[in-house]
From Swiss-Prot:
One Pfam entry name: FA_desaturase
Protein name: Acyl-CoA Delta12-desaturase
Topology class, membrane: Multi-pass membrane protein
Catalyses which reaction(s): (9Z)-octadecenoyl-CoA + 2 Fe(II)-[cytochrome b5] + O2 + 2 H(+) = (9Z,12Z)-octadecadienoyl-CoA + 2 Fe(III)-[cytochrome b5] + 2 H2O; (9Z)-hexadecenoyl-CoA + 2 Fe(II)-[cytochrome b5] + O2 + 2 H(+) = (9Z,12Z)-hexadecadienoyl-CoA + 2 Fe(III)-[cytochrome b5] + 2 H2O; hexadecanoyl-CoA + 2 Fe(II)-[cytochrome b5] + O2 + 2 H(+) = (9Z)-hexadecenoyl-CoA + 2 Fe(III)-[cytochrome b5] + 2 H2O
Placement of sequence motif Histidine box-1: 94-99
InterPro entries xref list: Acyl-CoA_DS, FA_desaturase_dom
Organism: Acheta domesticus (House cricket)
Function: Catalyzes the formation of a Delta12 double bond, acting on monounsaturated fatty acyl substrates like palmitoleoyl-CoA ((9Z)-hexadecenoyl-CoA) and oleoyl-CoA ((9Z)-octadecenoyl-CoA) with higher desaturation activity on (9Z)-octadecenoyl-CoA than (9Z)-hexadecenoyl-CoA. Requires preexisting cis double bond at the Delta9 position of fatty acyls to be able to insert the Delta12 double bond.
Top EC class for this record: oxidoreductase
Amino acid sequence: MDLNEESAPSGVLFEEDVAEQEAKMANGGPKKGKKLEEPYRLEIVWFNVLWFVLLHAGALYGVYLIFASAKIYTTLYGFLLCELSLLSITAGVHRLWAHRAYKAKWPLRLTLMVLNLLAYQNSIYEWARDHRVHHKFSETNADPVNAKRGFFFSHVGWLLCRKHPEVRAKGGRIDLSDLERDPIVMFQKRHYYKLVPFVSFVIPTLIPMYFWGETLSNSWYVSTMFRYCLSLNLTWLVNSAAHMWGNKPYDKNINPVENLAVAIGSLGEGWHNFHHVFPWDYKTSELGNYSLNFTNAFIDLAVLLGLAYDLKTVPVSMIKTRVGRTGDGSHDVWGWGDKDLPKELADQTMIENRKTE
C-alpha cells in the first residue's frame, strides 16, 4: 500500500455511527485519500527495540526456570496475573472504555483501572484513543496497527517505530470527551508512569518471595517478565493473526477475520470479523458460549453483582441482514434444515436410502 497517501474513514466506533457509515457506503464508499505533503520515512525507536528484545529474552529464560527451579505456586501465580491483565484489556479498556459497549459503576471501573496498570499496555486514555483510530481508519495509514504492512508490523513492529503522521493527525480528531469526563481514567492518565513500576513489576515480584519463599530470580523472570511478555503477545495476536487468517461470515470486504485460536488465547477477542462490523456489541461476537468468550462471562457476572449495566448487543435480525449482504458464505449452520443453509448446497446434497412412500 502507498504509505504516503492520506487515509479516509473506513469503519464505525459506536452504535450511533452506523447511519453515517451506511450513507457513505450508499454513495460509493470513502473517497480515496490525497497525497501527504512530505514523504513518509520509517523511523525506528531503538530504545523500544532494545526493551522488547530484553523482555522476550527474559521471558524465554522464565520459561526455562518454570521447568528448572520455580515453584509451582510461582508459575500458577504468573498465569493468574496474565489472565487478569488480559481481562483489564478485554473487559476494561476495550469493551468498556474504547467502545462504550456497556456501562460500569465506579468499583468495577476502579478495579479494571488497577488491573490495567498491571497489564502495562499504555494508559486507558491512550489505548482507547489509538483503538478508536484503528477502527475508524482500519487498514489505512492512519491505523496504528495496519495489518496491510505485514504480520510483524501489526503484531509488534508498530511499537518499534514512530507513528505514521496520519495516525497522529487522525488521532487528534477522535472524540475523547467521554474519557475526559471519567475521573478514574484521568487519574490514571496523570499518574500512569508513577504507578506502573510498582503495580506491574515491583509488587508481582515481591509477592512470591514474601508468601512462599520464592527466589528473586525465579520471581522476577517467571511472575514478571514471562507473565508480562505472554500477556502482550496474546493481546497483539488480535491485531495481527485476527486480521489475516480466518473466515469472514459478516463482511468479506474487510481484513478482520474469525479466529478460534486467538479467541481462546485472548479471552474472547478473536471473533474479529463480527467485532469490526458491530464494535458496540459487548460480547464482540455472535456467540454466547462462555468457554470461547470468558470476557462475556465476566461482564455478565458483573451485571449479576450490580456492577455493570446498559449492555449493548446486536439483534439477530441485524446480523442476518448483514450476513446475507456482505458475508463470505461461511456463517455457521446447525445442520440440515437450518434456514441459513445456502440453497445451492441444499440442492446438491445427496439423500441416500430414501424412504419410499
